[in-house]
C-alpha cells in the first residue's frame, strides 16, 4: 500500500500490553483514515452507552494517507473517542508536527484502552514502544511537560501530544495539545486522556511515507500549492493576519456573537482583529507541517513573553462573547488556556453562560463563593484572569464551571441561556446571519461545531460561490450535506480544512489518487465521506441521541430576532430545513438511519 503502513498500535494501559495490528487496502478504501478509522473501531469494539471516563472508552490517535507527505497541510491527525462533554462522538483535529512524526514512526493510528494505575506516558521510537512513568510531569503545564519529556528521552526532535492540568482533572472540555499551542481541542478528548492517567505520547520516527508515483504526485502538489497561493484568503488574508482576519469580516456581516449571542455586532471588533494583532503584537508566522498557508502566529506580550495565537475562535470566545475588548487580556487568557490544555471555544462559552446567568440573577454572588470572588459581568477582564486557573484546577466555583456551560445552566435553571448544541458550546458565528450554517450546527455529529460543515464559506465568503445567507432552499440544504461529506474526506485524508480556500472537491481526488495509486472518482471519495458521517450518526443514535429533541438550536436563534445590524429581524428557520435535510440524507422523518441506507453504505455489520 502507498500512503499507509497498514499498521495500528494498540496499547492497553490496564495490563501494559502493546500490540501491533494490521489492516489491508480494502479497509483503507472503505474508511480512508483519521475519523474514518476512529469511528470504525468505536462501533466495532465499544458499547456506545459506556461512561466516557470508564477504562472501556477507547482513545484513538489517527493519521490520514496524506499525513506526513508533501501534500499542502499534510500534517493533520485526529483524536477520536466518546465525548465526556456531549456523551456522543468526539473527533478533534490538530496540526503542528505530531501527526507527521507518528506517520514517520511507521504507524497509521494508536488505539489506547484501559487505565493505568499511575501517571504514564507512551514512548514510541519507530517500532519500539514503551509505557513509562510520568509522575514527574503530572501536574505540569503543557510547555513544561514538553520540555521535561524531551530532556528525559534525550531527543529534542521528538514530537509530543500531551494534556495539561485541565485534562488531568477531567475538565469536560480539556484538550490534547501538541507543539505547545496546537490543540485537538473540542469534545473533551483531553479529559478522556486524563481519565486513563495518560499524560503524553512521545514520538520519534525515521521513515518516510511512500506514494504511488512520486513524479506525478509532486506535479499535482505543485499545482495545488500554486492555487492556494493565488487565492485571496489562503494566499493573502490568512498568512498576513491569521485566522483573526475574520473578526472584521464577520462583524461587518452582522453575525459576530456578542455577550453570549445576544447580538451579532461588537463595536470594539477592530480592536481585537487580526489587523490590530499584527500591528501591535505579531513577531512572526508559524506554519504547521507542509503548510503553504502559514496562518499560525507568534505574538509577544511583556507579561508572558512569546506565545502563539489566539486564533479567530479564541479571540472571539475570550473577547466579544464575554463583552471584553482588551486584546492583551485575550492573548494572555488564550496562553493560559493552552498551557492548562483547555478548548477555548467551550471555555469562553461556559464563561459567557455564567455571565448571562449572573446578570439575570440566576447565579448569585454567594453561589460563586462570596464577595471576594470576581463577579460574572460582561466586560469584566478579571473573570478571565481568575476563573481560568480555578477551572483547570477545579477549585471552588471553578469545579462547577469545569463541567461546561450546559451542566452549569442546568444546575441554575437557565438552560435557555446556554448557547450550544448537544451540550457543546457554539463557535463564533451567529446562525441568524447564516441559516445554512445554523442547519449545520443543529445536525453536527459532535454537537456545536462550525468546522465540519463550514457554510460560512458560501454564505459569507463566497466559496465555492456566493449563496444568500437567508436562502433556505433545497440547494442550500444539499450544500450543507455536501460540505459535511467533503469535510469528512478532507479530515480522513489528513489535510486542513483551510485548503478549501483555493481547492475544490476534485483537487482532493487528484492528490489522493496520485499518492495512493487509486482510480477513484470524486463521487467515490464523497461516498466515503457519507459513510463516515452516517457511521458517526449511528454511534450517536446507539449512545442515546434523540434527533427530534437534539438536532436543534437554542431558542434564542429560533424565536428571538437579531436585534441589530445587517441581519436585524432574522431568526433561523430550522423547522423548514430539518425535514428536508433528513429526507435528502436518506433518513427517516425522525432522523434515524434506515436499514437500507446502512446497507447501501456498507454499514450492515453495525446494525
From Swiss-Prot:
This is Tungsten-containing aldehyde ferredoxin oxidoreductase. Tungstopterin binds at residues 76, 93, 95, 182-183, 185-186, 338, 343, 446, 452, 491, 495, 497. Homodimer. Belongs to the AOR/FOR family. The lineage of its organism: Archaea, Methanobacteriati, Methanobacteriota, Thermococci, Thermococcales. It comes from the Archaea. Keywords: 4Fe-4S, Iron, Iron-sulfur, Metal-binding, Oxidoreductase, Tungsten. Its cofactor is [4Fe-4S] cluster; tungstopterin.
